[in-house]
Curated annotation (Swiss-Prot):
Binding annotation for ATP: W365, G470, G471, N474
Subcellular location: Cytoplasm
Job description of the protein: Highly specific D-xylulose kinase which participates in the catabolism of xylose. Xylose is a major component of hemicelluloses such as xylan. Most fungi utilize D-xylose via three enzymatic reactions, xylose reductase (XR), xylitol dehydrogenase (XDH), and xylulokinase, to form xylulose 5-phosphate, which enters pentose phosphate pathway.
Species annotation: Aspergillus flavus (strain ATCC 200026 / FGSC A1120 / IAM 13836 / NRRL 3357 / JCM 12722 / SRRC 167)
Pfam family for this entry, one: FGGY_N
EC number per UniProt: 2.7.1.17
Family statement: Belongs to the FGGY kinase family.
The gene coding this protein: xkiA
A Gene Ontology BP annotation from the UniProt entry: D-xylose metabolic process
Induction (free text): By D-xylose, L-arabinose or L-arabitol.
Catalytic activity: D-xylulose + ATP = D-xylulose 5-phosphate + ADP + H(+)
Protein's name in the database: Probable D-xylulose kinase A
Superkingdom of the source species: Eukaryota
Length: 572
């Protein structure tokens, strides 16, 4: 059957990927362009250029033009019938900004299908580079953003996050100070996601409602740019000029932005009624890679740990991030990012293997898992024993804001007493379960208040906990995740490889163009998503008694963090 097809693009730091799906959400084509391996003429490493003297990390925008032609050529070689493509959306690395020059709209409109995008659009930008999320050149600007509304908590309350180096607002502030003449000649500023949509539209696309929340400029509660923060950011050119540069932000994440530009119709054979849907950020796109229901939790267990949740509750805090949901009005995306994830667990795993010895061909996690499963929750052999808890940070952490280090405590929930200790711990064995507990207790602590009771008198908790990334293969980690976070429906391993962002973007296009009036993304995708193709239940979720015991531990865990922060002279 020659049904409609939809393309989701993922413009990440190291590659551009396109995933083509049909109405049943089945992937039919994939094309990738690896920036380091496939590009010509750019002095990049891992997709970026680094200026260590100023802590700058940025990408040449022309590289992305070369990549888009490359990915579309790849789909053409595979035999994709472009005329069947009904809709296009995308995901872009969050926070990055693209600076368009005064000729941008004209150059986008006048593309010649006989020439490449790179040849024709390299002159469309007032500045040839886009700051990357790894850039940390904006400490001064972040301090100003945090102070401007009266503190980091006030900024988080307004925009969903405190100031971060990578966020677009602080980056624009630094840009207009460093390059005042270039800033004056900048006609528009796009995010990476809206830049991608602009290329397909043949004119500059509006910002996406979810991705706009990664700027420290969008007031989430007001649903508008924050006038005070624009004032801080705009400099001598003024607020109205910056508003014009940024443009309007439509509320509907599935809005029809317009039809595909003539260039793609003539060069690749796209149909003239192929519709462009707003592209969103890579993190919001990730929660669209499955029908994530409100209160479902998604935990990415890679080198670092990322926790994503869809929630109707807006409860901002300087340690977390809130964004408008990319498709569903009235919902928010909650996000936590930790630097210490898999690396910290591996340190303890290696210490255990050094002590116990391990045959070379054996699973390196076997000892760690066995000890974790044999150790009682919180290391309590009996209820009267103190709970063992600790913080294990081989690298500096951002949640909470602490130097690299290890801290171990005994906590007595009966009287609330907490003591730092090195005695009574059998190291490294006791640390196996303790580190997994520490990581999941931090998630539970910071997502408190975002979940509701699933009914039948059960305490508030997620419906499902989805684990992705390397750590999701580990049965002991999955079991402890369920014991601490709960999950009335259980703990699931989600198998979408590294395709989450592109899949989410493709699903967004399907939803936007095939939804019935008022039909939510979760409803439409939920009806078509074949969960047996993507997920496997790997552990129980809520267990009566155990979940409550960890609830008592949570009070001690929060006390422990505050005590260590106080000792280290830091404040949250």
């Amino acid at each position: 059957m020659q049904g409609p097809l939809y393309i989701g693009f993922d413009l990440s730091t190291q590659q551009l990927k396109a995933l083509v799906v049909n109405s049943d959400l089945k992937v039919v084509y994939v094309s990738k362009f690896d920036f380091d391996a496939d590009s010509r003429g750019f002095p990049i490493k891992k997709g970026v250029i680094t200026n260590e003297a100023e802590h700058e990390v940025y990408a040449p925008v022309a590289l992305w033009l070369q990549a888009l032609d490359g990915v579309l050529e790849g789909l053409k070689k595979q035999g994709l019938d472009f005329a069947r493509v009904k809709g296009i959306s995308g995901a872009g690395q969050q926070h990055g900004s693209v600076y368009w020059g005064q000729d941008a709209e004209r150059l986008l409109k006048e593309l010649d299908s006989g020439k490449s995008l790179e040849d024709q659009l390299s002159g469309a930008f007032s500045h040839p580079y886009s700051p990357n999320w790894q850039d940390s050149s904006t400490q001064k600007e972040c301090d100003e953003f945090d102070a401007f509304l009266g503190g980091a908590d006030k900024l988080a309350n307004a925009t969903g996050s405190k100031a971060h180096h990578r966020f677009t607002g602080p980056q624009i502030l630094r840009f207009q100070r460093k390059y005042p003449e270039v800033y004056k000649k900048t006609s528009r500023i796009s995010l990476v996601s809206s830049f991608l949509a602009s290329l397909f539209l043949g004119h500059i696309a509006p910002l996406d409602i979810s991705d706009a929340c990664g700027m420290n400029l969008w007031n989430i509660k007001q649903g508008a740019y924050d006038e005070k923060l624009l004032q801080l950011c705009a400099g001598p050119s003024g607020v109205e000029d910056l508003k014009r540069k940024l443009g309007a932000v439509p509320e509907d994440g599935g809005i029809n932005l317009g039809q595909i530009d003539r260039y793609y119709i003539e060069r690749y054979g796209f149909s003239s009624d192929c519709t462009i849907i707003p592209a969103t950020g890579d993190n919001p796109a990730t929660i669209l890679a499955l029908p994530l229901r409100p209160s479902d939790a998604m935990v990415s267990l890679g080198t670092s740990t990322t926790f994503l949740m869809s929630t109707p509750n807006y409860m901002p805090d300087p340690a977390t991030h809130f964004f408008n949901h990319p498709t569903t009005a009235g919902l928010y995306m909650f996000m936590l990012c930790y630097k210490n994830g898999g690396l910290a667990r591996e340190h303890i795993r290696d210490a255990i293997n050094d002590k116990l010895g391990m045959a070379g061909d054996k699973d390196p996690w076997a000892n760690f898992d066995k000890i974790t499963l044999e150790t009682a929750p919180m290391g309590q052999k009996k209820d009267s024993d103190p709970m063992k808890m600790g913080l294990f940070f081989p690298r500096p952490e951002i949640v909470p804001n602490l130097r690299a280090g290890q801290w171990r405590f005994d906590y007595n929930p009966a009287d609330g007493s907490l003591h730092e200790t090195n005695g009574g711990w059998n190291k490294p064995a006791d640390e196996a379960r303790a580190i997994v507990e520490s990581q999941f207790l931090s998630l539970r602590l910071r997502s408190r208040g975002l979940t509701a009771s699933p009914g039948q008198g059960m305490p508030a908790q997620p419906r499902r906990v989805y684990l992705v990334g390397g750590g999701s293969k580990n049965k002991a980690i999955a079991k402890v995740a369920g014991e601490i976070l709960g999950g009335s429906d259980g703990v699931y391993k989600l198998e979408i490889g590294d395709n989450a962002c592109a899949l989410g973007a493709a699903y967004k296009a399907v939803w936007a163009l095939e939804r019935k009036d008022g039909q939510t993304f979760e409803d439409l995708i939920g009806q078509r998503w074949r969960e047996e193709d993507f997920i496997e239940k790997i552990a129980d979720g809520y267990q009566k008694g155990v979940f409550e015991k960890y609830g008592a531990a949570l009070e001690g865990f929060e006390k422990m963090e505050l005590q260590v922060l106080k000792q280290e002279g830091e404040t949250r």
